[in-house]
């Protein structure tokens, strides 16, 4: 029987209502439990959380102790990757959805990248992938800079964690770490690339529509979200 795949926004918490990372993690876990229990339904449901976090560093499973910034709040998380920063001006998205009985995690990451690349094109930015490195990148002269990071986990065939798109955030916090463990490339923001301010709220609609399309889900909030 045909399966209807609907991706609905569960929560939007943008400036000035920044979402504490711990609260966002609890929301993810609640949605994960709900979606895990409904995987057998013919109508496959999925949920999306969009937010700007309060300033925080998060360390993925492969982060070593010496990679942690000194005298800063760091939260250990179960996603892939290493250490990164979240905070105001950065659009964070958590798609919580089933990947089916035989999850293809790499394909899922590539779909997220595709959605973000298409969203960047809507504001005139040419983002791209780099082989062997997750996320979305842009070219700055002779060097590559990351504009979006991706770190996911799949548990009981259902996804957790997601992506972080640098929109108008301060880049200074990244100077205290080696972002995602990549020492030979920098980070940037949409606003820095375009030389004008683009906030998470301004690009949210495009990101949601593009992610839905890339994941082949029906967007229940077509138009402005």
Swiss-Prot record:
<dbReference type="GO" id="GO:0033819">
    <property type="term" value="F:lipoyl(octanoyl) transferase activity"/>
</dbReference>
<keyword id="KW-0808">Transferase</keyword>
<comment type="function">
    <text>Catalyzes the transfer of endogenously produced octanoic acid from octanoyl-acyl-carrier-protein onto the lipoyl domains of lipoate-dependent enzymes. Lipoyl-ACP can also act as a substrate although octanoyl-ACP is likely to be the physiological substrate.</text>
</comment>
<feature type="active site" description="Acyl-thioester intermediate">
    <location>
        <position position="180"/>
    </location>
</feature>
<dbReference type="Pfam" id="PF21948">
    <property type="entry name" value="LplA-B_cat"/>
</dbReference>
<dbReference type="GO" id="GO:0005737">
    <property type="term" value="C:cytoplasm"/>
</dbReference>
<dbReference type="InterPro" id="IPR004143">
    <property type="entry name" value="BPL_LPL_catalytic"/>
</dbReference>
<feature type="binding site">
    <location>
        <begin position="149"/>
        <end position="151"/>
    </location>
    <ligand>
        <name>substrate</name>
    </ligand>
</feature>
<dbReference type="InterPro" id="IPR045864">
    <property type="entry name" value="aa-tRNA-synth_II/BPL/LPL"/>
</dbReference>
<feature type="site" description="Lowers pKa of active site Cys">
    <location>
        <position position="146"/>
    </location>
</feature>
<comment type="similarity">
    <text>Belongs to the LipB family.</text>
</comment>
<dbReference type="GO" id="GO:0036211">
    <property type="term" value="P:protein modification process"/>
</dbReference>
<dbReference type="InterPro" id="IPR000544">
    <property type="entry name" value="Octanoyltransferase"/>
</dbReference>
<comment type="pathway">
    <text>Protein modification; protein lipoylation via endogenous pathway; protein N(6)-(lipoyl)lysine from octanoyl-[acyl-carrier-protein]: step 1/2.</text>
</comment>
<dbReference type="InterPro" id="IPR020605">
    <property type="entry name" value="Octanoyltransferase_CS"/>
</dbReference>
<keyword id="KW-0012">Acyltransferase</keyword>
<feature type="domain" description="BPL/LPL catalytic">
    <location>
        <begin position="42"/>
        <end position="219"/>
    </location>
</feature>
<protein>
    <recommendedName>
        <fullName>Octanoyltransferase</fullName>
        <ecNumber>2.3.1.181</ecNumber>
    </recommendedName>
</protein>
<keyword id="KW-0963">Cytoplasm</keyword>
<feature type="binding site">
    <location>
        <begin position="162"/>
        <end position="164"/>
    </location>
    <ligand>
        <name>substrate</name>
    </ligand>
</feature>
<feature type="binding site">
    <location>
        <begin position="79"/>
        <end position="86"/>
    </location>
    <ligand>
        <name>substrate</name>
    </ligand>
</feature>
């Amino acid at each position: 029987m045909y399966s209807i795949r609907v991706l609905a926004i569960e929560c939007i918490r943008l400036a000035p209502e920044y979402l504490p990372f711990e609260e966002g993690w609890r929301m993810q876990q609640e949605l994960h439990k709900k979606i895990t229990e409904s995987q057998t339904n013919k109508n496959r449901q999925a949920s999306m959380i969009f937010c700007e976090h309060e300033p925080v560093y998060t360390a993925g499973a492969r982060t070593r102790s010496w990679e942690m910034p000194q005298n800063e709040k760091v939260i250990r998380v179960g996603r892939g990757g290493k250490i990164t920063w979240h905070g105001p001006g950065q659009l964070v998205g958590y798609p919580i959805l089933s990947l089916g009985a035989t999850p293809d995690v790499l394909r899922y990451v590539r779909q997220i990248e595709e959605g973000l690349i298409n969203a960047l094109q809507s504001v005139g930015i040419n983002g791209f992938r780099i082989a062997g490195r997750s996320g979305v990148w842009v070219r700055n002269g002779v060097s590559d800079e990351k504009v979006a990071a991706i770190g996911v986990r799949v548990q009981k065939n259902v996804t957790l964690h997601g992506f972080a798109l640098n929109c108008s955030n301060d880049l200074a916090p990244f100077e205290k770490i080696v972002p995602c463990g990549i020492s030979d490339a920098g980070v940037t923001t949409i606003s820095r690339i375009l030389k004008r301010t683009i906030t998470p709220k301004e690009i949210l609609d495009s990101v949601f529509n593009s992610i839905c399309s890339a994941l082949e889900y029906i967007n229940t909030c077509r138009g402005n979200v």
